[in-house]
Amino acid sequence: MHNESPIKRRKSTRIYVGNVPIGDGAPIAVQSMTNTRTTDVEATVRQIQSLERVGVDIVRVSVPTMDAAEAFKLIKQRVNVPLVADIHFDYRIAMKVAEYGVDCLRINPGNIGSEERIRQVVDSARHHNIPIRIGVNGGSLEKDIQEKYGEPTPEALVESAMRHVDILDRLNFDQFKVSVKASDVFLAVGSYRLLAQKIDQPLHLGITEAGGARSGSVKSAIGLGMLLAEGIGDTLRISLAADPVEEVKVGFDILKSLRIRSRGINFIACPTCSRQEFDVIGTVNALEQRLEDIITPMDVSIIGCVVNGPGEAEVSTLGVAGAKTKSGFYEDGVRKKERFDNDNIIDQLEAKIRAKAAMLDEITV
């Protein structure tokens, strides 16, 4: 029930990663990356399928060897989501996975090699109608750029990116997106801002090596939030030293918070105090776990007392405002006669949410 996002997105060109449109106003795609051994086909397929279940749009898979390329071929046949092959050092691996149906090639300008090698990769990508991501990383810049700037700077990252953008331009290849990632928030943000002024291609956002689940989520939310609020970004990945499933959840939460893209329930819940009339924290935790399968966008407010409860409920799809023994229930901003028993509030609210989701899904069909 909240208003649409006020963010005006940067105009960019359109490419496709598999069947997923990127850029030119398409929904910002949420990406993750497997952390299994790619040669372990079963483990990698299982992880990709777990990412599919939480709504991932694109999955990147590291392909460090020719053996991994052979495994990638088998993996691609068993999953539905578009796959990006992450290529470093050996350009021949990129050409091999292109034959095997990869949906996008990620190459690192800092280690992929000479312009002639890039030309061969581009020729292969063109032949197989595959886009490329130029993936610059502050930790692996070309040696001459490192020597020129002394340390990673926005100008250094963007110079690395533009060097390879120019190569693709000379080769008349425009099916690409670019990333300029860094582990430092301000370095990454500055790099993306500078790059956004120079090219029209889609930008893939990320704070690389952000950290564990908590610290990495915070870093990513700050850095990507700054850029997204300025309209910069067409795809994103939250890089966490954690289960990749968490990357997808955090990515969607960031987009929901900025009202850029909604998937599933946006829970609005108070931090609780002595005024709470039911167990708010337990209720929210239980519902988040129970309702992970709901992809229908909706706002659900769960407030433990009548101070802010009614006000939040009035601007939510569904809402509960705590009261003695039985709490008030709101739907589409209107208070209902029905009240929830505080001792059974989780089950009652789950039933209401599922029913509302089903109704909204019917309306949008």
Swiss-Prot record:
Against InterPro entries, the record matches this protein to: Dihydropteroate_synth-like_sf, Enolase-like_C_sf, IspG_bac, IspG_bac-typ, NO2/SO3_Rdtase_4Fe4S_sf
The reactions it catalyses are: (2E)-4-hydroxy-3-methylbut-2-enyl diphosphate + 2 oxidized [2Fe-2S]-[ferredoxin] + H2O = 2-C-methyl-D-erythritol 2,4-cyclic diphosphate + 2 reduced [2Fe-2S]-[ferredoxin] + H(+); (2E)-4-hydroxy-3-methylbut-2-enyl diphosphate + oxidized [flavodoxin] + H2O + 2 H(+) = 2-C-methyl-D-erythritol 2,4-cyclic diphosphate + reduced [flavodoxin]
| The enzyme's E.C. designation | 1.17.7.3
Co-factor binding details? Binds 1 [4Fe-4S] cluster.
Indicate which residues the UniProt annotation says bind [4Fe-4S] cluster: C270, C273, C305, E312
Q: Which Gene3D superfamilies match?
A: Dihydropteroate synthase-like, Sulfite Reductase Hemoprotein, domain 1
Query: Keyword Metal-binding, does the record have it?
Result: yes
What is the recorded function of this protein according to its Swiss-Prot or TrEMBL entry?
Converts 2C-methyl-D-erythritol 2,4-cyclodiphosphate (ME-2,4cPP) into 1-hydroxy-2-methyl-2-(E)-butenyl 4-diphosphate. Involved in density-dependent regulation of 2'-N-acetyltransferase.
According to its UniProt record, which protein family does this protein belong to?
Belongs to the IspG family.
What protein name is recorded for this chain?
Answer: 4-hydroxy-3-methylbut-2-en-1-yl diphosphate synthase (flavodoxin)
Record organism:
Providencia stuartii
Name of the gene encoding the protein in the UniProt record: ispG
